[in-house]
From Swiss-Prot:
Function description: Single strand-specific metallo-endoribonuclease involved in late-stage 70S ribosome quality control and in maturation of the 3' terminus of the 16S rRNA.
Keyword Transport attached: no
Organism encoding this protein: Chloroflexus aurantiacus (strain ATCC 29366 / DSM 635 / J-10-fl)
GO-annotated cellular components: cytoplasm
EC numbers on record: 3.1.-.-
Lineage per the UniProt record: Bacteria, Bacillati, Chloroflexota, Chloroflexia, Chloroflexales
Protein name in UniProt: Endoribonuclease YbeY
Protein residues bound to Zn(2+): 118, 122, 128
Parts forming coiled coils: none
C-alpha cells in the first residue's frame, strides 16, 4: 500500500525518519486503510509537547506522544471522494523517546517506533483511556504491529 507520511524533525533532532515512516505505514497497512491516506508526524522536544498538551488537552505537563485526529467534519472544505484521506497529525517528544528507552531497557529505535504506532492507532480511533478493555485491545494491536516491524518486546 502507498501512504503519504510526512515526517518533520525539529532542529537538532536526529531521529530516524525512515523508521517513523515505516512504523506509520505498518499501522495503516495492518488496519487495512485505503491507499493514499495521509499522516503528519513531528518529532520535537519535551517543551513543545508540554505546550501542546497544555494548549489542546488542558494538561500542564509534558508527555511522550500526542495525536490530533482529523475528524473530517470541517465544513469549510469540500474534498472529492477520490482524494487522499488526511488522518491527522502526531507529535512525539524525542527527549521522551530517549528517556523511556533507557527506562524500559530497549533501544531508542524501538521506543520511537512504538510511540509512532501508538500515535497512529489513536488517529484510527483506538483509545486506551476508554477503559481496561480498550487499553488491552490497543496494547495487543501495538505489540502485533511492533512484531511485524521486527521490534517485538524484548
Amino acid at each position: 500500500m502507498i501512504y503519504t507520511i510526512e515526517v518533520q524533525l525539529d532542529e537538532g533532532i536526529t531521529a530516524d525518519s525512515e523508521l517513523v515512516e515505516r512504523a506509520a505505514a505498518a499501522v495503516l497497512a495492518a488496519e487495512q486503510m485505503p491507499e493514499g491516506c495521509e499522516v503528519g508526524i513531528r518529532i520535537t522536544t519535551d517543551d513543545e509537547l508540554h505546550r501542546l498538551n497544555r494548549d489542546f488537552r488542558g494538561v500542564d505537563a509534558p508527555t511522550d506522544v500526542l495525536s490530533f485526529a482529523d475528524d473530517g467534519h470541517d465544513s469549510r472544505f469540500v474534498v472529492a471522494p477520490d482524494q487522499p484521506r488526511y488522518l491527522g497529525d502526531i507529535a512525539i517528544s524525542y527527549q521522551r523517546v530517549l528517556a523511556q528507552a533507557a527506562e524500559y531497557g530497549h533501544s531508542p529505535a524501538r521506543e520511537l517506533a512504538y510511540l509512532t504506532v501508538h500515535g497512529v492507532l489513536h488517529l484510527l480511533g483506538y483509545d486506551h483511556e476508554q477503559g481496561p478493555a480498550e487499553a488491552a485491545r490497543m496494547r495487543t494491536r501495538e505489540e502485533e504491529i511492533m512484531t511485524i516491524l521486527g521490534l517485538p518486546r524484548e
